[in-house]
Amino acid sequence: MMSLNPLLLVGGVIGTVSVLLLIAYACVKDKKTAMGFERSMADGEILRRLFGYAKPYLRQFVVVGFLVLFSISYDIASPLIVGYIEELVVGDFELKSLYVSVAVYAGVLVFSMASTYLQAVILQRVGQRIISDLREDLFTHIESLSHGQLNDIPVGKLVTRVTNDTNAISMMFTNLFVNLTKNAFVILGILVAMLFLNYELTLMVLCFVPFILLFTVIFRKFSRRAYRKVKDATTEINTYLSENLSGIKVTQIFGREDEKMEEFRQKSQTLAKATQEQIFVFGVFRPLVYMLYISSILCLFYLGGMGHLNHVTFLGQTISSGTIVTFYMYISKFFTPIQNLAEQFNWLQSALASSEKVFSIMDIQPQMVDAPDAVELDEVKGDIEFRDVWFSYIPGEWVLQGVSFHVEPRQTVAFVGSTGSGKSTILSLICRNYEFQKGEILIDGIDIRKIKISSLRRHFGQMLQDVFLFSGTIRSNIVLREENIPDEEIMKVCRYVNADHFINKLEHGLDEEVRERGNNFSAGQRQLLSFARTILHKPSVMILDEATANIDTETELLIQDSLEKMRSVGTMLIVAHRLSTIQHADNIIVLSRGKILEQGTHQQLLAAHGRYYQLYTLQYHKEQMDKQ
């Protein structure tokens, strides 16, 4: 060790270059398909948008930055202090000097721990606020999408975006950014400190870095693939659960529990296998780095011990026992952030991929947007007119073809026809759930495309066959928009639509619990609650889509009575399953394959012996046969 070993010098140079390459390589963006889907957004663009959410909390991040500097100072200074204490102990020293050194070390340690704690608390609070803001924006954007756009996105995928992907982004703010920066500066700071302390021992440590670089390249390749599999399998199982738990009653009715269980088992095993692969990759990488760490320690003890025993100097630097202790601590602090750096940059790329998936949802432009000159409607008389309206869900496959009709204020108009004739589509277009391709739809003489969507829908009350009730109480499901409505007014509406018949029998009345989707109530009871919800908000136009289908006779009588009362509220549009429920309608429009075949009153259509007559006769004979 009297002269510098050339091989040691070469190894040190290669090691230094490897450190820089390690940091640079970890920063390289993944390929477009690296995270399992076609990436089109640059990392810089993703970070810019994410930092837009972090901007309101810039002051807190500045504070965290100073706390990180304090932590880095401890990582660099503590080995020097311990090394100094070691030299005091082995030499002639006074207890006062030892006490001072120990006190300084303890003070630095306590200060560092306090800084780390405050840093974690601030980051967690800020990170959760940022993710809360992002989730709210994402949820609000999903609410703005049209029915057609929502039909194209599986619910399970949306749930994954709002939960799993935002959690990955949360890790970026609460952990990754700060620790990545900290680890990079710790590595460089320790490298400078070791060079300042002893060149030769530093070059020895750097000889091991090329191996770490090699392991990192291999690790990143396999860990990225493993993470992609876990992420894809998680999305797949979330989508499967969302669909099958919602339809579990159908599964039970048809006795398909075993088949569905087998499908779920396969997806669960796929996720388990992917997770095991991810664990294996991390389980191999860490021991390899640890092996290099142990090897460097052994070399330190050998070279350092030989240099210390032989009292060797190199470029004026001597190797004392304090130097060996200091290097021992530095090597530990040097290898740990290198190992973490490789893993954290991999998680960063995964978080960026999750961010892109979230932003890909937020970048979907809503099909239904207000025109720049859209107007608010203070009131609606209920005059509705279709003028040569054409509409298709799929380009070229027309669902409505040149439909024209006029509904006068306070009229009751019914739409009948076979499945797929366009009845429900007409009602959806009136509420602007979809955008029609040709023609005009007028409300009180105003094109609905020139009316603000929120204003338009505020004047409509929709009662569908498949009534959706939210988890909560009967009261919360009836009032929906306005929580300050008194119980007296709610019960008045319930009596009006005959919903009080079953509400009064419940133990908690309006405070009775409503479980998910209202599954603890019958179809008829859910329908009556839907009527109450609609009437309470005083709509000018009421829309009933198969509202009396699939209910028992007793409840149907209550609903029929409710419908008769509601006819006086305003304009009523009905899609009827049972023709007996629309005999008193002011106008009945008969549809077939998206075209109007005939229209008129019940008696006029029967006298015409057209399509309505055929439908009514078939249904009448069926009802007679059912009675027999």
Sequence positions of predicted segments:
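Hydrophobic alpha-helical transmembrane segments of ABC transporter permease domains
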Residues: 2-3, 66, 74-78, 84, ...
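Juxtamembrane helix-loop junctions of ABC transporter transmembrane domains
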Residues: 26-43, 66-67, 74-87, 108-155, ...
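Short intracellular "coupling" helices and adjacent cytoplasmic loop segments at the cytosolic face
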Residues: 55, 93, 128, 136-160, ...
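Helix-loop-helix
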Residues: 92-94, 100, 193-207, 277-356, ...
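ABC-type nucleotide-binding domain
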Residues: 363, 370-371, 377-628
